[in-house]
Amino acid sequence: MDSVDGLQCLTMTAENPPSGDLIPAPLVTCKLCLCEQSLDKMTMLQECQCIFCTPCLKQYMVLSIREGCGSPITCPDMVCLNHGTLQETEIACLVPLDEFQLYQRLKFEREVHMDPLRTWCPVADCQTVCHISAGDPGQPVLVECPSCHLKFCSCCKDAWHEESSCRDSQSAMPEHGALFGTDADAPIKQCPVCRIYIERNEGCAQMMCKNCKHTFCWYCLQNLDNDIFLRHYDKGPCRNKLGHSRASVMWNRTQVVGILVGLGVIALVTSPLLLLASPCIICCVCKSCRGKKKKHDPSTT
């Protein structure tokens, strides 16, 4: 077995045949690339004992780290009976150091997001994990950042509002720095649904949260889940702020209309066929039901 910084990599090795023996090394089929590889090019997972070729497993891990938002990396075999999960030692052995550090950071951020007793300080330059005192679930709790001493609400992350609800409170505290999401052009904002932090580096203003799949406008945080034609950017304060040319927007709408028309044509064509075939289908179902009833009826045996 190989080792990197004291961590064991479960790379398999084939037993050396006796000298003068020309028996070829056994080959194993990788379930990812479906290619046959020798045992020295395969890696076995600790938890489920599934075997994959090392290059495929490395690529799978890198993609899972970049797209998984810190969630556990599961066995790439879709029919794995043990539902194995990769251990941190395995990940550290097979991916570059920067990718492993990214995985640890995303995993920690996910743990903080899922923990009801921990949250991030909303000050952009702080990035401190704050502890929330236990209270009634869903009720606002005063949280004080141990680093910048900002007092904010545990629910809406706005400045603490003891005598008003989260919806009514829109106060800002510029003396503590720019809060996440208070500026339309802020590089980091919170998803309006799951409140996870999202950073926008480039691209259009139509955003989709990787955590809850909610689609919204980056500038005003309005819901865009049902706006398939992107009409939100035709009027109002976000007009022409989508980030694409007018021609590309029209082409997108044309494609959406084409898909809807195609589905409508398919429905019109298939509906008469279904109506004609429905008596035959009903007869077949009734016949099979009668057969099952006779088979299980004790009076006929």
UniProtKB/Swiss-Prot annotation:
A zinc finger (IBR-type) spans 101-166. Residues 26-242 are annotated as: TRIAD supradomain. The active site is at C204. Gene3D superfamilies: 1.20.120.1750, Zinc/RING finger domain, C3HC4 (zinc finger) (3.30.40.10). It holds the Pfam family IBR_1. Zn(2+) 5 binds at C217, C220, H232, C238. InterPro entries: E3_UB_ligase_RBR, IBR_dom, TRIAD_supradom, Znf_RING, Znf_RING/FYVE/PHD, Znf_RING_CS. Zn(2+) 1 binds at C30, C33, C53, C56. Zn(2+) 2 binds at C121, C126, C145, C148. The keyword Nucleotidyltransferase does not apply. It is a single-pass membrane protein. Keywords: Apoptosis, Cytoplasm, Membrane, Metal-binding, Mitochondrion, Repeat, Transferase, Transmembrane, Transmembrane helix, Ubl conjugation, Ubl conjugation pathway, Zinc, Zinc-finger. It is found in: Mitochondrion membrane; Cytoplasm. A zinc finger (RING-type) spans 30-80, 191-220. Pathway: Protein modification; protein ubiquitination. It catalyses: [E2 ubiquitin-conjugating enzyme]-S-ubiquitinyl-L-cysteine + [acceptor protein]-L-lysine = [E2 ubiquitin-conjugating enzyme]-L-cysteine + [acceptor protein]-N(6)-ubiquitinyl-L-lysine. Belongs to the RBR family. RNF144 subfamily. Members of the RBR family are atypical E3 ligases. They interact with the E2 conjugating enzyme UBE2L3 and function like HECT-type E3 enzymes: they bind E2s via the first RING domain, but require an obligate trans-thiolation step during the ubiquitin transfer, requiring a conserved cysteine residue in the second RING domain. Interacts with UBE2L3, UBE2L6 and LCMT2, as well as with BAX. Interacts with TBK1; this interaction inhibits TBK1 phosphorylation and 'Lys-63'-linked polyubiquitination. E3 ubiquitin-protein ligase which accepts ubiquitin from E2 ubiquitin-conjugating enzymes UBE2L3 and UBE2L6 in the form of a thioester and then directly transfers the ubiquitin to targeted substrates such as LCMT2, thereby promoting their degradation. Induces apoptosis via a p53/TP53-dependent but caspase-independent mechanism. Plays a crucial role in maintaining the genomic stability by controlling the degradation of multiple proteins involved in mitotic progression and DNA damage. Regulates epithelial homeostasis by mediating degradation of CDKN1A and isoform 2 of TP63. This is E3 ubiquitin-protein ligase RNF144B. It comes from Mus musculus (Mouse). The gene is Rnf144b.
